[in-house]
Regions:
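Mature catalytic domains of secreted/periplasmic carbohydrate-active enzymes
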Residues: 1-282
């Protein structure tokens, strides 16, 4: 799936998760198709402890999580809508337990992400990842794990457990592990099973020089000044067109993080800009 894709930071909290009922999946998927996206990176959750998808393993490990089960399986609906349009779904998840939810951190056996992850946590988190991997099966073409800052002490067996969980249900997934932003980190290999650069680059250079790597080339940057922020675009259509073209030449991916409104719709001005950038030349 080389070429252009979109990332969204859709992150309802425990107080707003009921609003997921209003998310317009068809409008969302149609917006991606209009922009000619080949893939989507979708957040399952981040650090507030709320997820947009049910997870049986999480509820076994942390029974209190059942109280915050979402009212619909949004990633499943999105995945099916994307499959109908030939767009690949990549799931986003932090590499560590939600750092702003002490209760979930405790029952999952995790500590601060600035410290090495305990073996108990790796086992628990792997079971959570496996549950989602098997729930979505071939609908999920990949995983993008954020915050892979400290992997010190993870044993070979621990990595094998986590990597097997990420591949469960579809063995040929893209797997990216994000160790940080910028030229020094966007292309790092942070896990034995990683096959895709995480790609995070807040200020991409005018032209890419893909570093020698066994990983598939990838650059990920927000269209606006910050992730998921509703604001004016930072880039012109020509800049986007050039980056997308260079990623294709490298047989890689260029992903643009784009904000959504409360109903899951892209901002019209952003859609128009990206459509211009991805338009096929006559």
């Amino acid at each position: 799936m080389p070429g252009f894709g979109v990332m969204v930071h859709y992150l309802p909290d425990k107080q707003s998760i009921a609003q997921v009922k209003n998310f317009d999946v068809e409008a969302f998927a149609s917006g991606l198709a209009q922009m000619r996206a080949s893939h989507l990176i979708l957040t399952l959750g981040q650090n507030n402890g709320q997820y947009i998808s049910p997870n049986s393993a999480l509820e076994v490990l942390c029974p209190g999580a059942a109280r915050n089960r979402p009212p619909r399986d949004l990633p499943l609906e999105i995945g099916e809508a994307l499959r109908a349009r030939g767009i690949a779904l990549i799931l986003y998840l932090p590499f560590r337990a939600p750092q702003a939810d002490p209760a979930l951190m405790k029952c999952l056996g995790d500590v601060s992400e600035q410290e090495p992850p305990p073996a108990r946590f790796i086992a628990a988190w792997s079971s959570v990842i496996r549950d989602w991997s098997e729930r979505y099966g071939p609908l999920a073409k990949g995983w993008w794990f954020d915050g892979t800052y400290n992997t010190q002490g993870i044993s070979a067996a621990g990595w094998e457990t986590l990597c097997d969980a990420a591949r469960s249900g579809a063995a040929n997934r893209w797997l990216a592990f994000n160790a940080g932003e910028g030229q020094a980190r966007f292309s790092l290999k942070s896990a034995p099973c990683q096959n895709l650069m995480a790609g995070e680059y807040m200020q991409p250079p005018a032209h890419f020089a893909p570093p020698p790597s066994e990983l598939v080339f990838h650059v990920l940057t927000p269209l606006t000044p910050s992730w998921g922020r509703e604001a004016a675009p930072r880039f012109t259509a020509q800049q986007l067109r050039d980056w997308i073209g260079e990623a294709r030449v490298a047989r890689g991916l260029f992903t643009l993080d784009m904000p959504l409104d409360n109903n899951g719709r892209f901002l019209p001005a952003h859609v128009a800009l990206v459509k211009s950038a991805t338009a096929r030349k006559p």
